């Protein structure tokens, strides 16, 4: 395997070629840093968290593909993944996971002790998540915790504590993550039913759209509460109204439960997250 091919394999294994997951992980993390700092976060902390998000998203993808390597070959969307297709060995993939995990932990060691403790919990959650798809119909709810764990870490890094507003933001991101990852699971629902993978898309059944809507409403409420507890104003409120618009559009996309529109609805959440972050940051400027 030449260097170019190896880079291609590694980038697909870590999803560097598909940054949507990294972005969905990044927006709430940046929101947490801005809220914790009351505006512009400490530059060192900001850089560490941006790099950390990229690395930990890569780690999560590796361990997910390792756990699903015998199943991914049976799913149309995932059968070409490097571990499923045999382009990379499990040993090499796990070695890359360890290297990246140590790099992320090295970054955390530049921060305070509370962040270090929270990071240990975060890496454990990251390792556990892929295996929940075999034992529970609600892996998306566990993913919501994993995907939101950077929020208390961001507050701890910036302020040395995790106040109530952090947990409002945590709850908002948890509800939002379950909603958009259920849309994502709707894409694979037929394949997952055949091979025994569990998901909220299967659990919710014919009520999937309605329950996703309830989670979107709950996310909105918690985003409002997080902003209220931090004394945010009109600009952030406009961002929340835009979030409602995105959520409505996503409901229209998933109405027919077809694969392509459901995936488009999932991708649309990146723009929702971007608008929330930008509106929050702008709220501190105006």
UniProtKB/Swiss-Prot annotation:
Gene Ontology biological-process annotations: ubiquinone biosynthetic process
Segments crossing the lipid bilayer: 20-40, 43-63, 96-116, 142-162, 167-187, 210-230, 235-255, 266-286
Keyword check for Ribosomal protein: no
Record field: catalytic activity: all-trans-octaprenyl diphosphate + 4-hydroxybenzoate = 4-hydroxy-3-(all-trans-octaprenyl)benzoate + diphosphate
Localisation per UniProt entry: Cell inner membrane
Pfam families to which the protein is assigned, alphabetical: UbiA
Enzyme class: transferase
The entry's keywords: Cell inner membrane, Cell membrane, Magnesium, Membrane, Transferase, Transmembrane, Transmembrane helix, Ubiquinone biosynthesis
Cited InterPro entries: HB_polyprenyltransferase-like, Prenyltransferase, UbiA_prenyltransferase, UbiA_prenylTrfase_CS, UbiA_sf
Topology in membrane: Multi-pass membrane protein
Domain of life, per lineage: Bacteria
GO MF term list: 4-hydroxybenzoate polyprenyltransferase activity
Pathway(s): Cofactor biosynthesis; ubiquinone biosynthesis
Chief location: membrane
Enzyme Commission code(s) on record: 2.5.1.39
Required cofactor(s): Mg(2+)
GO cellular-component term (any): plasma membrane
General function of this protein: Catalyzes the prenylation of para-hydroxybenzoate (PHB) with an all-trans polyprenyl group. Mediates the second step in the final reaction sequence of ubiquinone-8 (UQ-8) biosynthesis, which is the condensation of the polyisoprenoid side chain with PHB, generating the first membrane-bound Q intermediate 3-octaprenyl-4-hydroxybenzoate.
Protein family: Belongs to the UbiA prenyltransferase family.
Official protein name in the record: 4-hydroxybenzoate octaprenyltransferase
The organism of origin for this protein: Shewanella oneidensis (strain ATCC 700550 / JCM 31522 / CIP 106686 / LMG 19005 / NCIMB 14063 / MR-1)
